[in-house]
């Protein structure tokens, strides 16, 4: 299988009870940890209601995180296009491209929280049309030299062009999110953008195998529009927790996962669990079908390999940042993953392994010759 690189996806989703302002600073501290541990990307979401997701402007968060990190790439995960004028999205994206020294990726999507849409007077049935209209304009602004004029029922542009241009001649990296329907994957294929799949929803019958069909939608759309799309650019976001053993990992997670299931996903109609025993059983089922990756280092290596094979291959695995475990257990999980799981897939062990093997072979040959 092809190599995989690794990043993190920060919605964020913080359970009620903790000071929300302090949570923002803790999220910035997390960005520093990820940078130090060698994660290649951090994606930051946009939410405006429901209490758990409190980053309303991923661009502002990224501008701050860029000052506190050195290497990690930072992306909006995602800007909800129906909520914003497309010229402003494109203009701010290019500014971030410059402020981050070229470390920014513009991730876009249709939005997912009905209450956010209600606040803004947006019909949920209209979000896909708005997303497609907006992305067409954004793509033209970011890649073309001609002024853009476009009049719709929700935005207007007249002879619009960007003052700042992307830093690189190849343009500003662009990603499109996908959850369940083919819409996001087809849009990614249409523009040759990187698909960003939000893993597997916690509903009966869903499994990691569904992701393979998602990828095919992107391939088909790209072909229809005369473009190609590379699996190496496909991001897949999954929940991951590494501990010394599966039992320890479950102990770390079960209470936080139960709150997440019963409080956050309940808003979306997911049935609750009623005890820690029931929660452990439900969580174990998610692990067994690879919707969530939890366990020891070796178990997580096997699970990543299984997901890679089930999907047909992808380029980047994004670890969901969820407050299921306490702070220290979460930090240790990210560190264990970076030290012992990621190297099995990103090629960083190839040189030292080959060198050790060569020296060992030479030593065996010398001992044999001395007999």
Curated annotation (Swiss-Prot):
It comes from the Bacteria. Its cofactor is FMN. GO terms for cellular component: cytosol. GO terms for biological process: antibiotic biosynthetic process. Shows a preference for FMN. Activity with FAD or riboflavin is 3-fold lower. Disruption phenotype: Mutant accumulates 4-hydroxyprotoasukamycin. Its EC number is 1.14.13.-. Coiled coil: none annotated. Keywords: Antibiotic biosynthesis, Flavoprotein, FMN, Monooxygenase, NAD, Oxidoreductase. One of its GO terms (molecular function) is oxidoreductase activity, acting on paired donors, with incorporation or reduction of molecular oxygen. It catalyses: 4-hydroxyprotoasukamycin + NADH + O2 + H(+) = asukamycin + NAD(+) + H2O. Pathway: Antibiotic biosynthesis. It is an enzyme of class 1 (oxidoreductase). Involved in the biosynthesis of the antibiotic asukamycin. Catalyzes the epoxidation of 4-hydroxyprotoasukamycin to the final product, asukamycin. Can also convert some 4-hydroxyprotoasukamycin derivatives to their asukamycin derivatives, but cannot use protoasukamycin as substrate. Can also use NADPH, but catalytic efficiency is 20-fold higher with NADH. PANTHER family: BLL0895 PROTEIN (PTHR30137:SF16), LUCIFERASE-LIKE MONOOXYGENASE (PTHR30137). Belongs to the bacterial luciferase oxidoreductase family. This is 4-hydroxyprotoasukamycin monooxygenase. It comes from Streptomyces nodosus subsp. asukaensis.
């Amino acid at each position: 299988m092809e190599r995989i690189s690794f990043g993190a996806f920060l919605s964020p989703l913080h359970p009620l009870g903790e000071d929300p302002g302090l949570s923002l600073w803790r999220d910035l501290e997390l960005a520093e940890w990820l940078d130090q541990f060698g994660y290649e990307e951090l994606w930051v979401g946009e939410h405006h209601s429901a209490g758990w997701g409190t980053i309303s402007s991923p661009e502002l968060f990224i501008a701050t995180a860029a000052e506190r990190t050195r290497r990690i790439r930072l992306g909006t995960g995602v800007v909800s296009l129906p909520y914003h004028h497309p010229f402003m999205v494109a203009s701010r994206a290019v500014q971030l491209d410059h402020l981050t020294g070229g470390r920014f990726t513009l991730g876009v999507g249709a939005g997912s929280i009905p209450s956010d849409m209600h606040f803004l007077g947006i019909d949920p049935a209209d979000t896909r049309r708005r997303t497609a209209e907006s992305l067409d304009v954004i793509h033209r602004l970011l890649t073309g030299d001609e002024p853009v004029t476009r009049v719709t029922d929700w935005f207007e542009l007249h002879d619009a062009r960007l003052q700042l241009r992307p830093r690189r001649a190849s343009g500003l990296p662009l990603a499109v999110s996908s959850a369940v329907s083919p819409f996001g994957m087809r849009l990614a294929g249409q523009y040759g953008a990187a698909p960003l799949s939000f893993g597997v929803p916690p509903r009966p019958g869903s499994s990691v195998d569904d992701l393979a069909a998602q990828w095919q939608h992107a391939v088909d759309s790209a072909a229809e529009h005369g473009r190609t799309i590379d699996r190496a650019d496909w991001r897949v976001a999954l929940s991951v927790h590494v501990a010394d053993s599966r039992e320890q990992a479950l102990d770390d997670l079960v209470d936080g996962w139960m709150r997440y299931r019963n409080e956050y996903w309940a808003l979306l109609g997911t049935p609750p669990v009623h005890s820690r025993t029931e929660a452990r059983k439900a969580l174990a089922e998610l692990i067994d079908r690879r919707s969530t990756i939890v366990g020891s280092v070796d178990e997580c290596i096997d699970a990543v390999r299984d997901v890679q094979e089930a999907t047909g291959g992808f380029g980047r695995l994004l670890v969901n940042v969820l407050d299921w475990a306490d702070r220290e257990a979460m930090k240790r999980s990210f560190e264990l993953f970076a030290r012992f799981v990621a190297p099995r897939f990103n090629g960083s062990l190839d040189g030292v392994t080959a060198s050790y093997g060569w020296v060992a072979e030479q030593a065996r040959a010398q001992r044999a010759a001395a007999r």
